[in-house]
Amino acid sequence: MDLVIVESNAKSKTIQKYLGKEYIVEACGGHVQDLPKSNNATWSNDDGHLPKPPWGWTKGAEKTVNKMLKKASDKNVNTIYVATDPDREGEFIAWRLFAIFTKAGYHDIQRVTFNAITKKQVEESLEKASDVDMNLVDAAIVRRLMDRLVGFRASKFANSW
């Protein structure tokens, strides 16, 4: 049995119908981890590398992911397919899920994407599974860091007028 993780409940129900009982299809609900909320958060980095902040759980995500981990354990899941959206944010979510499931002892984790929720597209994507695109992940991290470093401060400054 294999686990497929998508972002939304609606997608999970449709894809579950396509794949049948050989798969468990679960929704993560979008972002599972993000930058800490602290306004004073700072992160150091090695020269030439992006900072490596401690990623914190988003609201409700830890409970959702723990349910997926328990189900994966109970059903003796072999392969985990992370089928988040095929964009920068989807890639970031996939990267965080890879890290979480790897830490939990799962090693056969694959990235899949599809542009349409059709039976054919879903089945073809499982056959073409790959790894996370770290260029897209880096782009998502930079956007988050810039939002935090510039956006939060600019907002505070603008509100002080």
Spans of features found by a protein language model:
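Intrinsically disordered, low-complexity regulatory segments
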Residues: 1-161
